[in-house]
Amino acid sequence: MEAMKMRLFVAVLVAAMAFSAVQQAAAVEAPAPSPTSDASLAIPAFFASVATLAFGFLF
């Protein structure tokens, strides 16, 4: 059971890193979001959610 949790945690981390890399590559050519857009908050919110889920699974 512990090994399965660790595999899931590693898989989520790899997916998050891949998602971040793809979004950074796309952001190079994209225009900046408008000041009223909350698009810049999507990545920190995603990492906070993943960290919370990982903490719940591990502890």
UniProtKB/Swiss-Prot annotation:
Per UniProt, the keywords (alphabetical) are: Cell membrane, Glycoprotein, GPI-anchor, Hydroxylation, Lipoprotein, Membrane, Proteoglycan, Signal
Q: Does the keyword Ion transport apply?
A: no
Indicate where the modification 4-hydroxyproline is found in the sequence.
31, 33, 35
Q: Which GO terms describe its cellular component?
A: plasma membrane; side of membrane
Q: Which residues are glycosylated?
A: 31, 33, 35
Which residues form the propeptide in this entry? 38-59
Q: What is its main location?
A: membrane
Q: Where is the signal peptide?
A: 1-27
Report how it sits in the membrane: Lipid-anchor; GPI-anchor
PTM note: Contains 4-hydroxyproline; hydroxylated on Pro-31, Pro-33 and Pro-35. O-glycosylated on hydroxyprolines; noncontiguous hydroxylproline residues are glycosylated with arabinogalactan.
Q: Where in the cell is it found?
A: Cell membrane
Tell me which domain of life the UniProt entry assigns to the organism this sequence originates from: Eukaryota
Lipidation feature positions (GPI-anchor amidated serine) = 37
Indicate yes or no for the key word Magnesium. Answer: no
Per the record, the similarity remark reads: Belongs to the AG-peptide AGP family.
Q: What does this protein do?
A: Proteoglycan that seems to be implicated in diverse developmental roles such as differentiation, cell-cell recognition, embryogenesis and programmed cell death.
> What is this protein's record name?
Arabinogalactan protein 13
What's the gene? Answer: AGP13
